[in-house]
A protein has these predicted regions:
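Fe-S ferredoxin-like electron-transfer domains
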Residues: 13-158, 164, 171-172, 176-183, ...
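Flanking helices and flexible, charged tails adjoining ferredoxin-like Fe-S electron-transfer domains
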Residues: 143-233
């Protein structure tokens, strides 16, 4: 759940460590460093508690990884593999909240792990306050703030910050790739791409290129090869 300076709420308890002289484990993300402190990050006690906490998170998470957009690039999946979690000792209890699949931003409540990153990034960075906690107890999850009737009638600017900072696949952009291929296959359609400046940088970063690298020519060439008729900056 940790995001430096933005989300330091110690919610997930995955970063627990053992401090010499203390009987209880503490969260590394919220415990101040002190002089002469001795910290054990991988003791048997730490490993056992960390494993249990991840198992509890997984018990409220839809683990259909093969059909998830974040498969292979998922913080929770990586944690589960690192901790050797291949079976769950707890019964599944997953909250499923309906969502408008036509909206460009798609939320899957079945995958939400209640890290609250989306809430904090939207509140503290974007200042839009779109997300909030709903329900109580074990049914607590994240949904559109009750200030808005629904996501379509909210102040969401579709900036994508909540998607970028979600550690799992609970938030994603609507996939319009099938519609694009359908248009490209139609010989009666003239297809035009207009590229926004921000896309150039984001596209390069996704390929592992440095932000200052010039990727516009590569992008134009790729789009033309895919089959678009015209590409404009």
């Amino acid at each position: 759940c940790y995001l430096e300076g933005i989300n330091e709420i110690s919610a997930c308890k995955v970063c627990v460590v053992e401090v010499q002289g203390k009987t209880k484990l503490v969260t590394a993300c919220s415990t101040p460093v002190q002089d002469d402190i001795v910290v054990f990050t991988n003791s048997p006690k730490v490993r056992a508690v960390r494993r249990t906490n991840v198992e509890l998170i997984l018990s409220q998470h839809d683990c259909l990884c093969a059909t998830c957009v974040r498969s292979g690039n998922c913080a929770l999946q990586t944690l589960a593999n690192d901790l050797g979690i291949f079976e769950l000792p707890y019964e599944k209890d997953i909250v499923d909240i309906p969502w408008d699949k036509e909206f460009p931003l798609i939320r899957d409540s079945k995958k939400c792990i209640k890290c609250m990153r989306c809430i904090q990034i939207c509140d503290k960075v974007q200042g839009l306050n779109i997300w909030d906690l709903v329900n109580t107890g074990g049914r607590t999850t994240v949904d559109v703030s009750d200030k808005f009737p629904n996501i379509a009638q909210s102040d969401c600017s579709l900036c994508g910050q909540c998607i970028t900072h979600c550690p799992v696949g609970a938030l994603k952009e609507r996939d319009d790739v099938p519609k694009i291929f359908e248009v490209l296959a139609n010989p009666d359609k003239v297809t035009v791409v207009q590229v926004a400046p921000a896309v150039r940088v984001a596209w390069g970063e996704a390929l592992g290129l440095a932000p200052e690298q010039f990727t516009e020519g590569m992008m134009v060439a790729a789009l033309k090869k895919i089959g678009f008729d015209y590409v404009f900056d």
